[in-house]
């Protein structure tokens, strides 16, 4: 039987990036609202592979801060920041797929990294941190969807043990490129 209450997961880790810089991975907090929102908007401007467009965001910095604090205090999900020299370089998190008993074992995961920090290992580190947190919270499976053209992300997920379980050829309808195929992936924890 799946527990009705999960563990609240706190995360803090310092890693060394491929270029030698230090990066802190940690739970977002209310004070991070402005920086996290700026990163969210920036990363969503930099690629067409994410779920939303920057102009669809309706959160203020204060609301983003409250969202981050709620996640930090939640037993259903986590929102992590990757911070380099006080700058938010990336965000990643997971949430329960749903609250019903039959799906309570599943978590839905996503991440984004500022393009200037790509290929330094931040995305990989955030992914593994979320896997670790999801496992610690009591989830048994973590899931994601990724645009099929995003081959580097798919390779990263496969290397971590995610397996494809389906595709939706019209999963996204991009303003720029039309329909984008989504690949659905999962990893047992």
What are these regions, as identified by a protein language model?
Residues 2-19, 168, 175-189:
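Terminal substrate-recognition subdomain of acyl/acetyltransferases
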Residues 23-36:
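A short beta-loop-alpha structural element at the N-terminal edge
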Residues 38-55:
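Helix-loop element at the rim of GNAT/NAT acetyltransferase active sites that forms part
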Residues 57-105, 110-116, 128, 188:
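Acetyl-CoA-dependent GNAT
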Residues 123, 127, 149-153, 170-176:
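Short glycine/proline-centered loop/turn elements that form peptide/ligand docking sites
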Residues 127, 134-145:
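Conserved GNAT acetyl-CoA-binding A-motif
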Residues 143-146, 158, 163-180:
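Conserved catalytic-core motifs of GNAT/GCN5-like acyltransferases
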């Amino acid at each position: 039987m799946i527990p009705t209450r999960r563990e609240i997961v706190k995360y803090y880790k310092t890693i060394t990036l491929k270029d030698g810089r230090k990066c802190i991975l940690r739970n977002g907090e209310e004070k991070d609202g402005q920086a996290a929102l700026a990163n969210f908007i920036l990363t969503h401007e930099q690629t067409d592979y994410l779920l939303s467009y920057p102009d669809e965001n309706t959160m203020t910095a204060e609301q983003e801060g409250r969202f981050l604090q709620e996640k930090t205090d939640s037993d259903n999900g986590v929102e992590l920041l990757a911070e380099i020299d006080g700058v938010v370089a990336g965000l990643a998190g997971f949430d329960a797929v749903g609250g019903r008993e039959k799906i309570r074992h599943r978590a839905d995961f996503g991440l984004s990294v500022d393009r200037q920090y790509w290929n330094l290992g931040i995305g990989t580190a955030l992914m593994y941190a979320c896997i670790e947190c999801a496992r610690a919270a009591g989830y048994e499976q973590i899931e994601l969807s990724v645009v099929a053209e995003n081959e580097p992300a798919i390779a990263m997920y496969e290397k971590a043990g995610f397996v494809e379980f389906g595709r939706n050829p019209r999963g996204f309808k991009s303003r720029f490129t039309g329909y984008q195929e989504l690949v659905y992936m999962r990893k047992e924890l």
